[in-house]
Amino acid sequence: MDVAHSKLPTHTHTQRDRWDLIVAHPPCTYLTVTGNKWFNVDRYGDKARQRIKDREDAVEFFMKFVNADCERIAIENPVGFMSTYYRKADQVIHPYFFGDPVRKATCLWLKNLPLLVPTNIVEPDVVHGDGFSMSGVAYFARDENGKILAWNDPRTARIRSKTYQGVADAIAEQWGSQRYYSQMSLFE
């Protein structure tokens, strides 16, 4: 561990101090509403009991971010269980607010952070390789040729959990720069 202070105002060495900002993207597998049918114990038995246990573990992990010793926290997850268990999200965004023409509701739970300001609102059409447009009504994971993937295809979870570049840029620009600018004022 480096214990020397940095000479650069934009860089902090690890000195066992607190985080400045946490932007968390905890796994949504057991927290999203899309898998709710699998929690029916009468119908799915042991599989449902295991999912209930997995959801409890996922909630515990999510809450570690909520309770982290950090001044500024953002937790991202789709519409799901945490809006009922914990509290409603502070903001619900879509990639089309930030230049990516996709409708995908994403919840943000915030601590001492402003709401993300949309940077480039576009029409939420989903156009696939075959030219078919769904006007953002539904979002299906598709392969590189535009073919809809089965729900249990290993690529589906990765594709559906994608963080779009416009959203990532907005997070970095709007939340990541706050500490930099506040530190720079020390040198004026």
Each model region followed by its residue ranges:
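Conserved active-site and SAM-binding loop architecture
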Residues: 1-188
